[in-house]
A protein has these predicted regions:
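Conserved, folded interaction/cargo-binding domains in eukaryotic regulatory proteins
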Residues: 78-120
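Extended alpha-helical interaction segments
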Residues: 1-77, 127, 131-138
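Eukaryote-biased recognition of C-terminal alpha-helical segments
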Residues: 110-144
Length: 144
């Protein structure tokens, strides 16, 4: 239950994050979701396909909040729920990765103000929700 509540809080704060990045990350400036040259496909369309970065962010937050608001397998505590949390964290991480690699000033400004990314990474590492092999943003002093 504790992990579930932290995930919900992160999503709430990420909603504000996405609303703010939308000023510089638009469908015109970032027509596809990518980070560090790696494209990411949006699963919100039935079959995964390319989507603008801001569209991907909105779709991912919507997907995650919907799943957190519905009944998670095992009441949010078993292996099935762990797989859902891992999938959610992997997709949410991509939003931060896009901001870091394509909107660095925004990323740094937001991180200095809220520490949201650091909290996100610490939560993911503590509960084995983010495989180290998929973390493409270099460790920051607040995430190491």
């Amino acid at each position: 239950r504790w992990l579930y509540e932290h995930m919900r809080q992160i999503c709430i704060e990420m909603g504000l994050y996405v609303a703010q990045i939308h000023k510089e990350c638009t469908e015109q400036t970032c027509p596809s979701m990518q980070a560090n040259g790696q494209p990411f496909y949006c699963a919100a369309h039935g079959r995964p396909r390319t989507c603008s970065a801001v569209g991907y962010a909105v779709h991912t937050l919507d997907y995650t909040m919907r799943h957190l608001s519905s009944a998670l397998p095992d009441g949010g505590t078993g292996d099935a729920a762990q797989k859902h949390f891992q999938s959610m964290m992997r997709r949410l991480y991509r939003i931060f990765a896009h901001a870091y690699f394509h909107h660095r000033e925004f990323f740094e400004r937001q991180e200095a103000a809220s520490g949201l990314f650091a909290r996100f990474v610490r939560l993911g590492r503590k509960h084995a929700l983010l495989p180290e092999s998929q973390l493409i943003i270099p460790d920051l002093p607040t995430t190491a």
